[in-house]
């Protein structure tokens, strides 16, 4: 049985973020703060996921902001210009899940 654990790290450009009000007592919008925290903890999070996949004896795939994602995003922007980048990332995640289901038994 083929198994995989996958994750996405798609860094949305600042100008495409759907800005949310700051957390109480802060001045930075929530979306910027979240983006900063993901950037700051990228290696830690990735290494934890790799470690978990190794313990589960599964493959591990991390999808990032690469040409495949850019092509997918451009397609979405042309066909559905009203869809936010955040939602495109979520649709991309579903697409990758479907793609992996063609290869793996468990995802």
Provide a role label for each language-model segment:
Residues 107:
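Short glycine-aspartate micro-motif
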